[in-house]
């Protein structure tokens, strides 16, 4: 709804859900304005997320760094044998769950590495469920069996995510550095469907497989996934070794535009670009071009955010060493659960407080009218520039302020 209008100064304040916008009227306003055509006549000045409660809504939890695959993009450089990062004990897992549950009730995704390599993974999930946490599981799928499906259901796991990076074994297995990985993922999807276990598919893309995006999307639908997340690589961990394979900013923009059109027409599969916060800018820009208001659907066990980068704002990662990180791709600790409570870290970490203060953002991101609904990928800025408050390096948008000033 329109919360305020002042046509004399040509300023409009707009509020839609949790997101607010400040716009000015562009040229050619010559018809009666209403909520359906307003977008076509406005030029953005700034966007913000209104009434934000910085509560932890979604936590990834690296319960092991061990993995049976050797993926080229792995954020944690996982391997079957990992030196210096042993699994924490079951007792420590219980302590962490008690700590989290005493403060919040987020979605908790048991991740890795490959979480199915931990013998107590289902005991951890069941305990988390008993504490009122919504437990999910992220697996590469290669270790899924009928018995695993039974254990998933018994533990009360709400959602499982699978990794699928190509529409064929040639592409996926190359990305995962393991022959047979594709067949394992497809088999896992089949077993989940047979056992009525809801699952989503995560797909990571670089130059080596970006031509597969449309095919993987269609395959995710065919497999019966609940949702499909298109991940744009953040070069951390082993991903640093494939920096030259990152999708170019120009191709990135084209893919986000394609995703917008696809999402508008998609009424079966929930879809979302991930680690692509500027998609929220693209949605607003395209909606304005189309002269329509685009309402996006949300997955029940998603991050719960109405904006782009949520690192340290609504989401976080707890790694196997009990460090609390802003997100899965942001290798900078905000604190350690062996030294502080989760509540203390979440509320008082200087790192998290920085990420929540958009006025501290630098470069084009700091000047951008979309900073409040995009924010740029803070992990990518940190990985590429070394400054987590720096400019998103893979966004080509020229902010309104900079365009007006000619800088």
Give short role names for the model-derived ranges.
Residues 309-313:
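Short, small/polar residue-rich loop motifs at catalytic or cofactor-binding pockets
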Residues 196, 249-298, 323-375:
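C-terminal accessory region of radical SAM enzymes
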Residues 318-319:
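Short, acidic, Ser/Thr-enriched surface-loop or helix-capping motifs
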Residues 62-70, 114, 365-372:
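Cysteine-centered iron-sulfur cluster-binding motifs in ferredoxin-type domains/subunits
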Residues 4-84, 98-101, 295, 342:
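N-terminal pre-core extensions flanking Radical SAM catalytic domains
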